[in-house]
A protein has these predicted regions:
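Outer-membrane beta-barrel transmembrane domain signature of Gram-negative proteins
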Residues: 186-196, 210-284
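Membrane-embedded beta-strands of outer-membrane beta-barrel proteins
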Residues: 97, 135-137, 191-195, 229-233, ...
Length: 563
């Protein structure tokens, strides 16, 4: 059922949540950069030089401070301080600093600072500069007997412009640009506290819990408060079989509060889950049996307060665990949150003006989810994963354009949210090949068939996705890397015709995403590495979203310091 929700002011609103099948989703093989894991959390190390976060279902770091590490690789020894600084040809600075140290024998500290921005506008378009800043601090202690505590705070500031207007085709005055293509800022302040037992011995009760708080607000008055609580209990015992493979019973509990407003009226939502389970494993199998009960306050009358979904998964290992067959049935609901939506699409319409509505956020509901596939490691050289996914989802979200009339013309550069019921089938493949000790190839492919009930297409969701990353160590000092990202089969719902009192809408196929980057690192010594990156080599002006092209080719250069 496609859904048009109604806001508090009796205006029509389209709304969306989010689910995207991902090739690198659960229990993936070693296909992403690994860092050594100390007893405390590392700050985020991702730096993305693009003008807005394009969340491919196959994400890769364009600039990575750490290299790839396979199962047999020797991990890089962590340093207390890592700093990366560079500049792109579009006045695009990138900066990353992370610190990790043990303040005492039982107290660890992690600090992270990140900045990336671009200050030159895209030719012919409205102002398109952007800036992303982040800061976080984490502490972890194991001072207390049998318990580990961790906590931290963070701050994020993201600035974008609603630049999706071609001024060569639709000239605007400075006043009109300020009104229809304004600057937008999103600020997020948050913190977390975690507790976990350090002992998991047979016959003992283990537990873990996390408390999270997040406050997000934008320039135009939209605000969201979020509180999340997760707590898990587990008891392990040898009720039968091999003493080296005990069984486990457990209970996972969750509670969330989300309060969002774009006006003076606050929309409060509450979500909870209860998930009892039983686990057992042996040399050749693993089995997880559970059931999930969740409840959420409803905005749409058709939505139920309570829902029960399966939580079942298992694996079968053969050939001395070189080959794994896995399958699972899952489901459940997830709150669609303002902070998560604008992180994916920062061009959401949040400014409340006369004759305009604002977005409503519901709960995405996976009524049934199946996943299955095989994983294998061939001769310690090739990691291969083949899988299939199926999702039957209610309140599945899509982005749709909003429009403004300007001097008998139409501007479409902000997005609202639309829900529909969907059935999605995905075929996935991941492979990682390591030849000798110098050449590594990572390949990924996904075919997605998403069928909405009422919408003509699954707006902005790609049918085909692919990735390729090659890393080659020429010698002890010089290394090269190449990344190719591809997406095809994306459609946008756009304005097709209009009169004095109505707008017509129709589908348009977007240009395929083809993004190739070439990079190199030169190790001056153990502390200093110089890097260069040529991004979007083919100078493709593909669109992140309709009317939002990327900048094209750009050259980055800088240094990485470890000390």
């Amino acid at each position: 059922m496609a859904l048009i929700a109604t806001a508090q002011h009796d205006e029509q609103v389209t709304v969306e949540g989010k689910y995207r099948p991902k090739v690198n989703k659960v229990n993936k093989l070693q296909l992403t950069p690994e860092t050594p894991q100390p007893s405390y959390a590392y700050p985020s190390t991702e730096v993305n030089p693009k003008e807005a976060k394009q969340k491919f279902a196959l994400d890769l770091e364009k600039i990575a401070p750490t290299g790839f590490a396979a199962k047999k690789d020797q991990l890089v020894t962590p340093t207390k301080n890592f700093l990366m600084a560079g500049l792109g040809t579009r006045l695009s600075p990138v900066f990353l600093y992370k610190h990790n140290s043990m303040l005492t024998k039982t107290l660890g500290l992690g600090v992270g600072i990140k900045h990336n921005s671009s200050w030159l506008n895209i030719k012919d378009y409205a102002p398109s500069s952007y800036m992303n800043n982040a800061f976080d601090v984490n502490l972890t202690t194991s001072k207390f007997d049998g318990i580990q505590l961790d906590g931290g705070v963070f701050y994020k500031n993201d600035m974008v412009h609603y630049y999706g207007v071609n001024l060569a085709e639709m000239p605007l005055t400075d006043e009109q640009i300020e009104q229809y293509c304004p600057r937008q800022t999103y600020n997020t302040i948050g913190g977390h506290l975690g507790i976990a037992s350090t002992s998991t011995r047979v016959g003992e009760l283990s537990h873990s819990g996390n408390l999270d708080y997040q406050y997000t607000f934008d320039r135009f008055g939209a605000k969201e408060h979020f509180v999340g609580l997760e707590y898990g209990l587990g008891y392990t015992q040898n009720w039968w079989g091999d003493k080296n493979h005990p069984q486990k019973v457990g209970l996972d509990l969750g509670f969330q509060y989300d309060g969002f407003t774009a006006t003076e009226e606050l929309a409060n939502r509450i979500f909870f889950k209860v998930n009892p389970f039983f686990e057992m494993k042996d040399e050749f199998y693993r089995l997880h049996l559970g059931i999930r009960l969740d409840g959420t306050t409803t905005i749409v009358p058709e939505d139920k307060f309570l829902a029960i979904r399966p939580d079942v998964s298992g694996s079968l290992f053969v050939l001395d665990k070189k080959l794994e067959f896995y399958a699972g049935l899952k489901g459940g609901r997830k709150l669609v949150r303002f902070s998560e939506v604008v992180e994916e699409n920062p061009f959401l319409y949040t400014q409340f003006l006369p004759n305009h509505s604002f977005s409503v956020f519901l709960a995405e509901n996976v009524k049934l989810g199946f996943e299955g596939g095989i994983r294998t490691n061939i001769a310690e050289i090739v990691d291969l994963h083949l899988g299939v996914r199926y999702r039957h989802t209610e309140n599945d979200p899509f982005y749709v354009l909003k429009y403004d009339f300007v001097d008998n013309a139409v501007i479409c550069n902000r997005f609202d949210l639309l829900y529909d019921e969907t059935k999605t089938v995905s075929v996935l493949a991941d492979m990682r090949v390591k030849l000798r000790n110098s050449l590594t190839a990572d390949l990924g492919f996904a075919y997605n068939s998403c069928k909405p009930t009422n919408e003509e297409y699954a707006w902005y969701r790609p049918t085909m996705e692919g990735k390729l990353k090659l890393t080659y160590d020429f010698n002890d000092k010089l290394a090269f890397n190449t990344t190719l990202l591809y997406q095809g089969g994306r459609y946008a719902l756009i304005q097709s015709d209009f009169g004095s009192n109505w707008i017509g809408w129709g589908p348009e196929k977007l240009k395929d995403v083809f993004d190739l980057s070439l990079g190199a690192d030169y190790k001056v010594n153990d502390q200093i590495t110089a890097f260069v990156l040529l991004d979007n080599v083919a100078h493709q002006k593909y669109q992140l979203y309709y009317n939002y092209p990327v900048t094209g080719i750009q050259f980055f250069a800088g240094v990485k310091l470890r000390f």
